[in-house]
Amino acid sequence: MKKILAEITYDGSIYHGFQIQPTKPTIQGEIEKALMKINKKKVKIHSSGRTDKGVHAKKQIITFDININIQLNNLKKALNAILLKNSIKILKLKYMKNSFHPRFNAQKRKYSYRILNSNNYYPWEGYQAHYVNKKLNISNLNQMAKILIGNHDFTTFSCIKDKSKSKFRHIYLAKFKKRGKYIIFEIIGSSFLWKMVRSIIGTMLDIEIKNESISTFETILKSKNRNLARTTAPANALFLDKVYYE
């Protein structure tokens, strides 16, 4: 039995998240079905993390154990022949030690969020982006983003259903940058709570749109009160960009 690591990318628009669900289409479900067609036996995959319904991935990491005699390049081609029509693509395959786990060995994760901030755009440019009508002040947004850097209790920005024992997370980078008609928010952290990134984004945007003080964001973060967080930003504009390992 060989452990294989796969770098994958996907459009999460039509899926009910990564984690398998019995009656709904998921990323894990589609990949495991594709592996079963090739392996002729059930294959369970493990991931670096579970993206929510509608969230995309530029580079997600998964592993699986398989016991068939096939070259990795041919396995990649066979999987993509099945998966590409379902908006999932295998970018890379390689063998890993049996002790490796994509989630528990991960050191950091990077997410990005696309905000369409222009009135002059084509309809398709709003796909995989969150449209904000008001012209946003990147300087204000970045001042709020700096507040996130370091180790904090993110209870305020956690989902009520999140069962994590600790709500503390370490944020290494958080910044906004202009890219044409878009404003991109990038964040790197040790890991993230369920819907944490979208809750942070939604709160920062609401404060900026309403011209509230930047200190309001810090007060909300330190409150550890979920009820003070603003509307959670839509999932369609969120991407898992990269997972970091030693």
UniProtKB/Swiss-Prot annotation:
Catalytic residue positions: D52
Superkingdom of source: Bacteria
GO molecular function: RNA binding; tRNA pseudouridine(38-40) synthase activity
GO term, biological process aspect, one: tRNA pseudouridine synthesis
Record's catalysed reaction(s): uridine(38/39/40) in tRNA = pseudouridine(38/39/40) in tRNA
Residues the record lists as binding substrate: Y111
Record-listed E.C. numbers: 5.4.99.12
Keyword Iron attributed: no
Keywords, comma-separated and alphabetical: Isomerase, tRNA processing
Alphabetical list of InterPro entries matching this protein: PsdUridine_synth_cat_dom_sf, PsdUridine_synth_TruA, PsdUridine_synth_TruA_a/b_dom, PsdUridine_synth_TruA_C, TruA/RsuA/RluB/E/F_N
Pfam families assigned: PseudoU_synth_1 (PF01416)
Record's function text: Formation of pseudouridine at positions 38, 39 and 40 in the anticodon stem and loop of transfer RNAs.
Known partners and oligomeric status: Homodimer.
Record protein name field: tRNA pseudouridine synthase A
Annotated organism of origin: Borrelia garinii subsp. bavariensis (strain ATCC BAA-2496 / DSM 23469 / PBi)
